[in-house]
Amino acid sequence: MFVKQKSGGKKLEEKNNQENIENQEQNQEEVREEKPLTEQEKDELIKKLQEEVETLKQKLQKTEEAAKRLSALYQSIQKDFEDYKIRAIKEREQIKEESIEKFAKAFLDVVDNFEKALESFKVSNDINAIMQGIRMTHYQIMNLLQSYGIEKIEAAGEFNPMEHEALETLKTKEYRNNQIVKVLQAGYKYKGKVIRPAKVVVAISEEEEIT
């Protein structure tokens, strides 16, 4: 029984070897059967490769052209933005100059009236006339400021730290605690914004002081 198994294994090995030999012979035969390319086949292959190269060149050219267009567009936008900034600066300067010019023209009327009042002071001893000229000049100045959005801060009643600045305090029984007693310097607002607080004296009781 053992001898028969060994004989069968040997036959299998011989069969495998034979198949390997046949495969090798077949491969060699296929190699021998391969023929070199003909001139026509070579030309066709070269033509195909050239067409592929030309296609790639065209794609590259289109990409480069698109990049140039984007670069030109970017430069154009950048130039437009720089021009806009220059125009904006010039426009702001022009608006500023026009505002100053407008204010100056309006203020010249006040100056003219003030100079007339000064001339009248030289030739007149009428105190009432002098005071009337001063009041008129002051009235014109306040109207001019108001026309430009500048208004005087109301400095009466209770002290408001948002609009008033306490330079002094006064212990008194005539005013309630934290009431404005006196205005030392008028305050002003421009379009609702405090540009200078009113400097005031504030009343305090004996127990409390303004801080």
UniProtKB/Swiss-Prot annotation:
CDD domains: GrpE (cd00446). Keywords: Chaperone, Cytoplasm, Stress response. It is found in: Cytoplasm. One of its GO terms (biological process) is protein folding. Its main location: cytoplasm. One of its GO terms (molecular function) is unfolded protein binding. Homodimer. Residues 1-43 are annotated as: Disordered. Participates actively in the response to hyperosmotic and heat shock by preventing the aggregation of stress-denatured proteins, in association with DnaK and GrpE. It is the nucleotide exchange factor for DnaK and may function as a thermosensor. Unfolded proteins bind initially to DnaJ; upon interaction with the DnaJ-bound protein, DnaK hydrolyzes its bound ATP, resulting in the formation of a stable complex. GrpE releases ADP from DnaK; ATP binding to DnaK triggers the release of the substrate protein, thus completing the reaction cycle. This is Protein GrpE. Belongs to the GrpE family. It comes from the Bacteria. Pfam families: GrpE. Residues 29-43 have a biased composition (Basic and acidic residues). It comes from Sulfurihydrogenibium sp. (strain YO3AOP1). InterPro entries: GrpE, GrpE_coiled_coil, GrpE_head. One of its GO terms (cellular component) is cytoplasm.
